[in-house]
Swiss-Prot record:
Organism: Influenza A virus (strain A/China:Nanchang/11/1996 H1N1)
Disulfide bonds: none
Protein name from the UniProt record: Non-structural protein 1
Ranges spanned by the short sequence motif Nuclear localization signal, renumbered to the chain: 34-38
UniProt motif (Nuclear export signal) ranges: 137-146
Keywords: Eukaryotic host gene expression shutoff by virus, Host cytoplasm, Host gene expression shutoff by virus, Host mRNA suppression by virus, Host nucleus, Host-virus interaction, Inhibition of host innate immune response by virus, Inhibition of host interferon signaling pathway by virus, Inhibition of host PKR by virus, Inhibition of host pre-mRNA processing by virus, Inhibition of host RIG-I by virus, Inhibition of host RLR pathway by virus, Interferon antiviral system evasion, RNA-binding, Ubl conjugation, Viral immunoevasion
Amino acid sequence: MDSHTVSSFQVDCFLWHVRKQVADQDLGDAPFLDRLRRDQKSLKGRGSTLGLNIETATCVGKQIVERILKEESDEAFKMTMASALASRYLTDMTIEEMSRDWFMLMPKQKVAGPLCVRMDQAIMDKNIILKANFSVIFDRLETLTLLRAFTEEGAIVGEISPLPSLPGHTNEDVKNAIGVLIGGLEWNDNTVRVSETLQRFAWRSSNENGGPPFTPTQKRKMAGTIRSEV
């Protein structure tokens, strides 16, 4: 198991604990409480996948955060916050790629939380890359504008977009939707890669083959989700 995956989970558990304390003191608004509930479900799922106890992970996460805060000077903290709080908009796709109409021979649509996943299940044995335009804050994907799947020839064969009726989504929502899209495309023997920018800010890591760091268990689950919907 990758040590970065474990430490990220541990820190996320502790930060969720801190946010829970804020909520318990009636200091959180409705969106804050909604994210808290969503992230709780996400942490339970990640803990089950990683085989880690959430309570133990929270304690270790606290130690990691305390060590970082102890080592960081006030000036370094101010500089980090100044850069991190500035939201950035990153673009894998051109305006033409974002606005281009596309058609599906065998359309498939699935709602994944507050996101809509669409794909053409007629596509087989293709090399596909996922590109996205999104905003980033704290070096993590904040809001997805649009994600599209392209073949090497430039044809659009899949898409993930926010649902207008369900505004607001989390980084985990986006990763789950990407998992659904990848699972559906790989079911037809396509090879799917994720853009380096998307890997960096959605997963904070990258694989040499361009794929997101899904575990074998997660991949089987994604494929099963698509098969059950077909």
